[in-house]
Amino acid sequence: MTIATPEVANFPFTTWQPTPGMMPIENIQVQLIDTPALDRDFLEPELLDLLRRTDMILILVDLQSFPFDQLETSVATLEQAGIIHIDRLDHYPDDRRWYTKPILVVVNKCDDETQLEDFKVFCELLEGGWSCIPISAQTGFGIDGLKQAVFDRLNIIRVYSKAPGREADETSPFVLDAGSTVEEFAGEVHQDFVAKLKTARLWGSSDFDGQMVSRDYILKDGDVIELKI
């Protein structure tokens, strides 16, 4: 999924320190960090801090080796650090501070049709609120679906800048939070553009190409913006 080269093996506890890598999703790069297993007696404070600051958590379980136990142990470890799945917030008391994160359960070793049937059973037996993605690291099955699921759950959009009289550069989008406005996009292009912005024209989600839009117009994924200052 990334060009990182952590040590891998067909047994647990291979990863001993966080290893970053960049995962391409269409025309953007998303950083993934391979962490040590969470089912250990001691977790370094640096690792817990990393987990609290991340935008999203992927819990990898082995379908062929007690996946329920793996998930339960990982979730319990995260709970001890105050980290919970944002879709399961109503399962927890509101008398403490929680770090809420979107969490995907990535189920590895779905290598053939038999394992895919086991995956379906695994999902059916889980309590509500969990999103599970089947993959096979051996065959590559499900990797594209996982990438799309990560993009969707990050809740981000890609917006392209266009200079007057030129075509938009669609190779290097600006990545913004979903719900971002034209004004927020201008600030990402350059901090001075917010105060100096006179007009903005939009191609994409507008009623017609090149439509003038206001500063508070909410952008959509794939929009092209031409700013005039």
Which functions belong to the PLM regions below?
Residues 9-10, 44-47, 212-215:
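Short beta-alpha junctions and helix-cap segments that line functional grooves
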